[in-house]
């Protein structure tokens, strides 16, 4: 694991030295001194605008001209317009620096924060850069028996030279905890579905959360049947692996602090059931439990900080498999709420899982607010691509807060509409509702949201986050490799911390 230290005095044992320069390309007195030590290498580089313009995210790795000493490379990082810098951009810059260091095979680097960054203290800037680098260091290689030499290389340590190293280290300690929660989410999403059965996944949740003082209850199929969870159980009835409902309760606040319920879709693998998906890219359905993983990650981040809040997490863990015992198109299931649903498409299963999970959360814990997170519909990806997740809500203030926090942590949300006409599209001829809309190909993400909305009690604030387009990526980003993104952990953690 990457080791990050904050120091008041610069060490001479680092192979790479990082400095930051904005688009004005001006050197302050500290950078002038550093430039002189390196025989004008920094000033020569920024004078040649073909090499370096100072725009945000530009990284220039230059071999050092100093013959003695450990520093082999200078790494110049562009800040762009400092007035436009955000916390998310600074974190991404940290990730890019780490990636360039890996490409240049620089195993130890020092970040020198000599110039003042407008709007950010040096310790805040330092902790954000460190957070981005730490997030970018994530790898999932546990099933790789051989690695290429380039893949084996990793940056061993980062030393950050700042004027208040103690405060920077305290800030980073929290960010590191949140990053480790993101890593859990990425790990469990990347895990092959033959390994992370509902039982194994539930055990991992217990193992990770109980040391933080979170009460975890794993409910099996017999108890779910007694509770009347016909919708969730119907999804999993074709699998030989028993479905689980995992209930996590963190009581960090006083009794008068309202409870928030986080509910996640945990479809361990989604074949589509009898409404079978095409085989192309079906392997990516290992990520169909990304909503549940985001909920667990948020619980880790909140409980790890001992925040004075009351949070409940409920995740339904099922496999949607075809078999002689599988749910059929046209089946009618009775949900825990007593409402009935006609299953017109067994591949619209996530909303069935959520229907019972959100009802259970409301019945048992009486939350003020319910936020469900799910890789629910392909339709949201058609609408928003991989840039935004969809946000549906019955409360404008709740939606606005989530969207604002999403911008701040670069886990973006776009408000999507709820409307009576969408709700009417899920009416069924033989049951209370159908699990898909009655107009093929129309408003798929909106009708799915309305299905869940029918299980939200009056007076409960609710938001539904459809993360199908953002939970995993087929390309690397500044903050991590391709595969599971860990989307939602930082969004939910910051929302809970700032608004509860």
From Swiss-Prot:
Residues annotated for Mn(2+) 2 binding in this entry: 265, 270, 288, 349
Active site positions, chain numbering: 277, 351
Biological process per Gene Ontology, one example term: proteolysis
Signal peptide: none
Co-factor remark: Binds 2 manganese ions per subunit.
Main subcellular location of this protein, as a coarse class: cytoplasm
Cofactor(s) required for function per UniProt: Mn(2+)
Record-stated family: Belongs to the peptidase M17 family.
Biological role stated in the UniProt entry: Presumably involved in the processing and regular turnover of intracellular proteins. Catalyzes the removal of unsubstituted N-terminal amino acids from various peptides.
Name of this protein: Probable cytosol aminopeptidase
Protein's organism: Rickettsia felis (strain ATCC VR-1525 / URRWXCal2) (Rickettsia azadi)
Classification lineage: Bacteria, Pseudomonadati, Pseudomonadota, Alphaproteobacteria, Rickettsiales
